[in-house]
Amino acid sequence: MSKPIKIEQGIKYRDADKMALIPVRNVAEEAPKEVLRKPAWMKIKLPSDSKRIQEIKSALRKNKLHSVCEEASCPNLAECFNHGTATFMILGAICTRRCPFCDVAHGRPLPPNAEEPSHLAQTIADMKLKYVVITSVDRDDLRDGGAQHFVDCIREIREKSPEIHIETLVPDFRGRMDRALDILQGTPPNVFNHNLETAPRLYRKARPGANYQWSLDLLKNFKEIHPEVPTKSGVMMGLGETKEEIIQVLKDLRAHGVTMLTLGQYLAPSRHHLPVERYVPPAEFDELKEIALELGFTHAACGPFVRSSYHADLQAQGLEIK
């Protein structure tokens, strides 16, 4: 038997090391021997000019900021960076959770950087962004789950960029929802996003430490406090869910007041993560979009490369995203 890994503060644990820390044994050791080959519709054409990409990466490093685009190995990084957009990840780059679908590092994070809100706001102002998405790692080590840091960032951003629209993609604030919502109450974003990620049957496998109903309640409770702010959620496909399960997730979201939806294809970051069970054809995403609109979603971005913050500004305008 191998010795347990000693988690040291500030150290990133990824891939095999991260998976070894997950109490639910269902990842690499139970993965299929043959990895599914990507179909033609999953091929990405990289931009020929990477100058803008390097400029954004340099700006992030200069201001000691993180993007979820990089930390989560998003397949759309090149496209988004090349168009001058990024989803900023606050509260560090080490997550207290260890979800086996996610490429963000796990470990014991350092205390929040008090200068991050001002650095973030200045970077956004320098980039002249009109729409920005702010997300974070899970911070179960903080009494408010990081809610005050979100508020500090929103305030600083709006002070330097008064016309900007801010979307927050928040964690579930496990065990501290009421406290977090109370803190957020005075400084709400323009869009409040929290991802369900998958069907409830797959939570033990894909989201150990999370609870499906808790996440739904977070979305519902925020909406009750701020009925004027759209709520949004994202779901991955290809983890072993059925079409019927996804439709039920959509119904649950609508029953809890959510009006904005993203559906995208799950891609395994490495062989150590949960394997892709199925590549969902574009036509099936189109069908699910029609179902979502029939259920009452006002915005539904559905397609293989759709991610929660992919072209979030266009999503908010209701434009078609695939």
Curated annotation (Swiss-Prot):
EC number: 2.8.1.8
This protein's pathway: Protein modification; protein lipoylation via endogenous pathway; protein N(6)-(lipoyl)lysine from octanoyl-[acyl-carrier-protein]: step 2/2
Binding residues for [4Fe-4S] cluster 1: C69, C74, C80, S309
Subcellular location: Cytoplasm
Cofactors named for this entry: [4Fe-4S] cluster
CDD domains from the UniProt entry: Radical_SAM
Domain Radical SAM core: 81-298
Cellular component GO terms held in the UniProt record: cytoplasm
Matches recorded under InterPro entries: Aldolase_TIM, Elp3/MiaA/NifB-like_rSAM, LIAS_N, Lipoyl_synth, rSAM
Pfam families: LIAS_N (PF16881), Radical_SAM (PF04055)
Reactions performed catalytically: [[Fe-S] cluster scaffold protein carrying a second [4Fe-4S](2+) cluster] + N(6)-octanoyl-L-lysyl-[protein] + 2 oxidized [2Fe-2S]-[ferredoxin] + 2 S-adenosyl-L-methionine + 4 H(+) = [[Fe-S] cluster scaffold protein] + N(6)-[(R)-dihydrolipoyl]-L-lysyl-[protein] + 4 Fe(3+) + 2 hydrogen sulfide + 2 5'-deoxyadenosine + 2 L-methionine + 2 reduced [2Fe-2S]-[ferredoxin]
Molecular function GO terms recorded: 4 iron, 4 sulfur cluster binding; lipoate synthase activity; metal ion binding
Cofactor comment text: Binds 2 [4Fe-4S] clusters per subunit. One cluster is coordinated with 3 cysteines and an exchangeable S-adenosyl-L-methionine.
Main location: cytoplasm
Signal peptide: none
Domain of life: Bacteria
Positions annotated to bind [4Fe-4S] cluster 2: C95, C99, C102
Keyword set, alphabetical order: 4Fe-4S, Cytoplasm, Iron, Iron-sulfur, Metal-binding, S-adenosyl-L-methionine, Transferase
PANTHER family: LIPOYL SYNTHASE, LIPOYL SYNTHASE, MITOCHONDRIAL
Family: Belongs to the radical SAM superfamily. Lipoyl synthase family.
NCBIfam families recorded: lipA, PRK05481.1, PRK12928.1
Protein name: Lipoyl synthase
Organism expressing this protein natively: Photobacterium profundum (strain SS9)
